[in-house]
Amino acid sequence: MIVPMKKLTLAALLEHREAILQALQSICAVQLISIGEGEQSSAAAEGRVQRLQSAEELLKPYAGKAGFGPKPEATRQELEEDIQPALEICAELEGLQRRIAQNGSDTEKRRLQLGSLLPWADMTDPLEKVHSTASIKVMTGTVPAEGVKALMETGALVQLYGGDKERAALVICPNEEYAGIAPSIRATGFQEKCFGDIRGTASENIQRLRTEIEALEAERAQLEARLAAFAPKREEIRRALDGAAIDRDREQSKEALAHTNTAFLLTGWVREDMTEKVRREIEKITDVYYLAFEDPSEGDAVPTVLKNSRLITPYEAVTNLYSLPAYGTIDGTPLMAPFYFIFFGMMLSDTVYGAVLALGAWAFLKYLKPTGMMKNLAGVLMQGGISTIFMGLLFGTCAGVGWPVIFRGTALENTFPLIDSSTNPMGMLMVCAAFGIIHMFYAVLIATWNCLKHKDYMGALIDNMCWIFIVSGLIMQAAPMAGLSRSVAEFGKWLAIVSAVLVFLFAGRSKKNIAGRLISGAGKLYDVTSWLGDVLSYARIFALGLSTGVIGMVLNTLCWDMLFASFKGNPALMLVGFIIVTVLSVALHVFMMLISTLGCFVHTARLQYVEFFGKFYEAGGKAFRPLGYNTKYVNVK
């Protein structure tokens, strides 16, 4: 169901603002509405969050992979007390990070210098002495290998040194000749490069740079080791990060408030069933306040909160993946949950797969204690596994083995499955179509009820019930083939005809002229084809159920009838073969189960979204986002 909401208005003294916001945050009950500029007080809190996030990311490469397990628990006060010590750790990490960055910059600078000097290693002259004089032009640089010959022919004195694709070149010529041969030198691709203030020979500088690079690399290793030593502190930083995020959210909430020098005003949305709890929390802090709860006004952007029984709540994940219902409309979650449960089991339809899935999801919920969407998805899979256990017995297999094989020689040999998809595909298709028609009729009845609730009687009859009558009438035409009286088919014919006439005449009742109404009605009658298409959509239940069983049987045949048979003849080989085939068979079945589960989840959801929700559901709801503890690493007690 959609929880009724109230609009909260609270006025209190400014000195109690922090305590009141902490109390509201602790009960996670109020979504604030911005009513003014407020004060921009969250910059410092956001800065703390950013610093802690950066520190956590910095330590990630040095920390081991997170193990599976429930989140640790802590109180808000404990998390907030961790912030200052963690910020001190951040300061040390930031210092190390700066030194590592500087080290990297210095190392790269020396590597570049080393690379530029290596081609000159054979030149014995000190680099500071290689320069032009009053009468001689001296140039050092590089020339492409293909330009060497042309450079030698320019008329300048050229001395070549090391290099592969590019050669280091010392070019000397009289000053008075330089202007004439400079264009020829440039045409060879010669790029002049100076040694700057480097002193000593190239080989001496190469050795110096290599020594400095080695020292820098050793220093970097030490810095990295010091950084790695902080890895155990990562959990402390994570706790502090959650505490800082709580502070940040509370500080940001202040920006939504209006205030004077002595008082503040707060408005927001609160669940109707939480109003008294909000009042009690405020009364614990002060008795000087004004608090009012009002019903939403028309045009208000009211957030949507879903509340269902423990059994139905997991299916809210399926609804949320589609869209929350608009506030004041129908929550489709409890309405579609039984069908999702049944269809999922029929699609997976293998008892062993269902048992493994249910146990795995149960263990995930019990020991890892997920929250939010992950918890609900695990709940859906657990219930889907339970459904699969029974549907596998009724319509499917057991780890790819047919039930007649398992029950061979017993009284149940010809009892299960009730319908075998592989031997009676038409029977299974009829069952799927019947479930589909029931599913869609149920959706139309919900839409009819909604119309009656809003006193739209014509909508209830023409837009909804007439389609049930039309489809039912068409189905009744098959009555004689089922051994029923022809009068049933005759009644169905007239039921469909009368309903079709009503749709033709009144489906376009919103049009002002008769011609427009009739044209609209004729177009509406064409929707009968979409009904037929929707019924065919339920064939996917048969298709996925059949594929699960057939592929499971193929895996068993490959592993046991073919691969294991190749080991027969030698007892030792048979033992080795049995182990290999068992491991391979289990691995293949697990892989098959995972792939099939994904397909079942998606296709079952698709049937709810298109064939079911499409007939009555009003999407577009906005999620309720109260001020609360939005933590990532720790559950707040």
What kind of region is each of these model predictions?
Residues 1-336, 364, 371-374, 378:
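Long, charged N-terminal accessory/stalk domains
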Residues 1-6, 18-21, 25-32, 276-637:
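Conserved, carboxylate-rich catalytic/transport cores that coordinate ions
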